[in-house]
Structures are given as structure tokens and as C-alpha cells.
């Protein structure tokens, strides 16, 4: 499973700075969708070949007695369900009553925690950290999140136990290297590795995660999909943050249904108050191929829904949206709901939207048509010649802009990975292309390849000049001739 790191601390200690550094996105097209809220509290982070989820739990401000009331309920749940807690304090401001209150609260949770003293750049780190020994910690870690100093070692220490556990579980050797430079760009797959990834995906069942806010009908939809008389035997022992994985078959296609709400007998569904778990939902998104977001038609789409969609986009997951409880609404309300969806979901205009009733089964069957379509789009093999031809057509329709007096030249394109589809474009100065032109290329590929239900990632590689590192080496006769010419030029002066 993907480890979860929670950032905890009072306001203005640098949690957002560290969050932004950890959740940086290589390709602006992945994160910078028009209309997508940027006020995210959780995100996907990369450490070498290791992925993890990072959660900014928000600032706590107040006295010890105010900890329970000042901290949001979801933040408490996120801390409780996280694998590691990074307790951040401000080295310049020193120890405060809020820091003491938070430390006491974390001790009660008995959660693996690391005290992180931030903002130690330009000052004596040991002197700035001295007061924090009063918190009774065994060790503390000094960083400057704004400049990235110390972040590599911190993340290495936090994730190393999980890398070892994963290595033992898979019987593989895990290579944890340094945290990659923020400006560095790399291609996820070579063409050969992309081909291997394609073959692997064809042999696997589709992992479908049903996510959404509490009481939107996730359990009802799950039971509808599995069948009315299905006896629930999937509540296997495990931690409360583990989702339930249910193998199933539909239309001669194998699936694994990832249920974040828990499958319950129908008679108990209405009696159970569902507890929403952010961590459980994020882990389900990470582990899925296709994400099905369920929305209640009787409620407005929330910022939380948009944040979940944004997380799914950044994770590269295919997306299908279902609006539940559609039956019984009058036409005026339906029109208003559709307009609101169009207004707020423009950044996922590639995703199919279905209007269903999970309770009565209306429209549920069509969901799997879109799930299969999205997965097929995410895993369809496209050759280098086709991708290059589409790229040439795009540049003929709209030339790349000039950069520093020279026009950007796109040479060729090839597949760089699947699920999501990754297109690698090689050329001169391609990394200097503006986001607007990158978005034009992405939309052009989507229309040309008829890709629906999945985000597209385009990565750019500057072609290397094979003669750039070479110097002209003159022969002896050439050296003599050059000297004679130089002396003649000087003589004329």
C-alpha cells in the first residue's frame, strides 16, 4: 500500500511550503487544469521510484484545551490514519504553547512522529532547536523547506522503513536514491519499457475504485453492482484504513472493485452512518486504474469533490463521474444541476458523466461501458509513426512560438507509458514551450486519437547536439595557415 505522510503544526511554520515542494508536478499540464482548485490539502508525491501521499492537516492555533476544537475532524482522522506524522515547528519563532499542545496530542495517539524544525537557514540550527527538546522528543530534524535543505534526508528517514517492508514483501531490491532536483525532468518509460507496461496491463483485471463523500450512495451502488443476494464475505481482518478488494466479472471482463465505504448487507445500509476517510479514499485512487466519483444530485458539487478529482488527475487515473439519486428530481432541478456540473467540471471535460439511481438500478449498466472505454483509452498502443504524424499536423495548424529569437522545433514523438498515456516529444528548446502551446498539443492528440475518460501526459525532451561537446582540432598545416592569416590581418591594421 502507498504510505501516507501527514504534516502537522500550527499556522505559518512552513507546512504549505514543504507540501508544495513534496507534491511538485513535472508537467504543468497535469496540475494546471483551468478551473481546478489549487487549494489542495493532500497530494501525490514522488521519491525516486517510491510513491507516497502527503496531507497538510491545516494549522492549529490556540491553547492545549483548544486542540480538539480547533483541529478539523477530518484532520484528526488523517493524523490517526497516517503512517508517519511530520510535526513541524518554526525554528525562528521558538517554542510556543501551541507547539506544546500539539505535541501532547500526538503523544496520546502513539503515532510514529518526527519533530521537524523548519526555517533554520541563515541561523545556528542547534541554537534555534534547543528549546524544542522540552517537548520530550528523542530526536529532531532541521530543514529549510523554502530552499529544500534537509528535505532529502528527512524524506529518506521517513520512507526508508516502508521501502524495506515493500522490498521484503515483493522480494525485490529497492533503490532509494536522493530526492530528485525540482527542475529536473525525465521520461517515465523508454519505448521498450512502455511496450512491457502495455503487455502487463492487458493481462490484468481492471481495478475500479468507487469514491465520494459520505452518504452519496457508494454502498448502495456497490451492492447493486454485486447483486441483490450477494452474501458479503469480504470484511477480512485488517486496519480501518484498508479498503475492501472484491474480484468480480462483468461482460466477460475481470474487475477488482475497490470499495472505500465497506460492503454491507442491504438491510443494514440505512442504519449505518458512514465515516468518511480521506486516507482510505486517496489510497484507493492510487491503487485503481479507473476512478468512479459518485456525486449526490440533491447536493451541490463540493470543493472536496473537486479536490478528489484533482488528486485522481495528478495520479494519472482514468475518471468516470456518476450523479446519483437522479430519479424523482423535477426537470428544472435537473437542468440546474447539469449547468452547475458544466461550470465546475470543465477541467475534466474528457470524463463521461452518467445520471443514475443506485437504489433502483437506473443507468448503472452504462457505467461499465464508460469504465471500459476509459481503460481502453488509457492502455491503447499507439505507434511512433502515428504520434509523430499527429504532431506534424498540429504544428502545421499552429506553429510553435519563437523562443529567444529562434522557433521551437518539434522533431518526433513516441509513447512513453500507459495508464495514463504518456507521449514523449523530442525537439529543440521544447522545454521552453509555453503552457498554452503544451495544452494545445494535448487537446490535439486527444481529438486525433479519440481519447476519452483518461488524462494525457506530454513530456518534452530536448534533443542533444552530438557535436556540442566536441572541439575542432586543427592539423599542423591548418594551424600554420591560421597563423599566417592572423598575421596578415594584423599587418593590414
UniProtKB/Swiss-Prot annotation:
Keyword Repeat among UniProt keywords: yes
Residue numbers binding GTP 2: 212-219, 259-263, 324-327
Coiled-coil parts of chain: none
Pfam families found in the cross-reference section: KH_dom-like, MMR_HSR1
Residues annotated to bind GTP 1: 9-16, 56-60, 118-121
Entry keywords, A to Z: GTP-binding, Nucleotide-binding, Repeat, Ribosome biogenesis
Residue ranges of every copy of the EngA-type G domain listed in the record: 3-166, 206-379
SUPFAM superfamilies the UniProt entry points to: P-loop containing nucleoside triphosphate hydrolases
Matching CDD domains: EngA1, EngA2
KH-like domain residues: 380-464
InterPro entries according to UniProt: AAA+_ATPase, G_ENGA, GTP-bd, GTPase_Der, KH_dom-like, KH_dom-like_a/b, P-loop_NTPase, Small_GTP-bd
GO molecular function, one term: ribosome binding
Any Gene Ontology biological process: ribosome biogenesis
Keyword set includes GTP-binding: yes
Function of the protein: GTPase that plays an essential role in the late steps of ribosome biogenesis.
Quaternary structure and interacting proteins, as annotated: Associates with the 50S ribosomal subunit.
HAMAP family (alphabetical): GTPase_Der
Protein name: GTPase Der
Species this protein is from: Vibrio atlanticus (strain LGP32)
Amino acid at each position: 500500500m502507498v504510505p501516507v505522510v501527514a504534516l502537522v503544526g500550527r499556522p505559518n511554520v512552513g507546512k504549505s511550503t514543504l507540501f508544495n515542494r513534496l507534491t511538485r508536478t513535472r508537467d504543468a499540464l497535469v496540475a494546471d487544469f483551468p478551473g481546478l482548485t489549487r487549494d489542495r490539502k493532500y497530494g501525490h508525491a514522488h521519491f525516486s521510484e517510491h510513491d507516497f501521499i502527503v496531507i497538510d492537516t491545516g494549522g492549529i492555533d490556540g491553547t492545549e484545551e483548544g486542540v480538539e476544537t480547533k483541529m478539523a475532524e477530518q484532520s484528526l482522522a488523517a493524523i490517526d490514519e497516517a503512517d508517519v506524522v511530520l510535526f513541524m515547528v518554526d525554528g525562528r519563532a521558538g517554542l510556543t504553547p501551541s507547539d506544546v499542545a500539539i505535541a501532547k496530542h500526538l503523544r496520546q495517539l502513539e503515532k510514529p512522529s518526527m519533530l521537524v524544525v523548519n526555517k533554520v537557514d541563515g541561523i545556528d540550527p542547534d541554537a534555534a532547536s534547543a528549546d524544542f527538546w522540552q517537548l520530550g522528543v528523542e530526536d529532531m530534524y532541521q530543514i529549510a523547506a523554502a530552499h529544500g535543505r534537509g528535505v532529502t534526508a528527512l524524506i529518506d528517514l521517513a520512507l526508508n522503513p516502508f521501502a524495506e517492508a515493500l522490498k521484503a514483501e515483493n522480494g525485490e531490491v529497492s533503490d532509494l536514491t536522493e530526492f530528485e532536483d525540482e527542475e529536473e525532468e525525465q521520461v517515465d518509460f523508454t519505448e521498450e519499457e512502455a511496450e512491457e507496461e502495455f503487455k502487463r496491463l492487458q493481462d490484468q483485471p481492471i481495478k475500479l475504485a468507487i469514491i465520494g463523500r459520505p452518504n452519496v450512495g457508494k454502498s448502495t451502488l456497490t451492492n447493486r453492482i454485486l447483486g441483490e443476494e450477494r452474501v458479503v464475505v469480504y470484511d477480512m481482518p485488517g486496519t480501518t484504513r484498508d479498503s475492501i478488494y472484491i474480484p468480480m466479472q462483468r461482460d466477460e471482463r475481470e474487475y477488482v472493485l475497490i470499495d472505500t465505504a465497506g460492503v454491507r448487507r442491504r438491510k443494514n445500509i440505512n442504519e449505518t452512518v458512514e465515516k468518511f476517510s480521506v486516507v482510505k479514499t486517496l489510497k484507493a485512487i492510487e491503487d485503481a486504474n479507473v476512478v468512479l466519483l459518485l456525486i449526490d444530485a440533491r447536493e451541490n458539487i463540493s470543493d472536496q469533490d473537486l479536490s478528489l478529482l484533482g488528486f485522481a488527475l495528478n495520479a494519472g487515473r482514468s475518471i468516470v463521474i456518476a450523479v446519483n439519486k437522479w430519479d424523482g428530481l423535477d426537470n428544472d432541478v435537473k437542468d440546474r444541476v447539469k449547468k452547475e456540473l458544466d461550470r465546475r467540471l470543465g477541467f475534466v471535460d474528457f470524463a463521461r458523466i452518467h445520471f443514475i439511481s443506485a437504489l433502483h438500478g437506473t443507468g448503472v449498466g452504462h457505467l461499465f461501458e464508460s469504465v471500459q472505454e476509459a481503460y481502453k483509452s488509457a492502455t491503447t498502443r499507439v505507434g511512433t509513426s502515428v504520434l509523430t504524424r499527429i504532431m506534424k499536423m498540429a504544428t502545421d495548424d499552429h506553429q510553435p512560438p519563437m523562443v529567444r529569437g529562434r522557433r521551437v522545433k518539434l522533431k518526433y514523438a513516441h509513447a512513453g507509458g500507459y495508464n495514463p498515456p504518456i507521449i514523449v516529444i523530442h525537439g529543440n528548446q521544447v522545454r521552453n514551450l509555453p503552457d498554452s502551446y503544451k495544452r494545445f498539443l494535448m487537446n490535439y492528440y486527444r481529438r486525433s486519437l479519440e481519447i476519452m475518460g483518461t488524462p494525457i501526459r506530454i513530456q518534452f525532451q530536448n534533443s542533444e547536439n552530438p557535436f556540442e561537446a566536441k572541439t575542432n582540432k586543427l592539423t599542423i598545416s591548418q594551424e600554420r595557415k591560421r597563423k599566417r592569416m592572423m598575421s596578415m590581418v594584423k599587418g593590414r591594421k
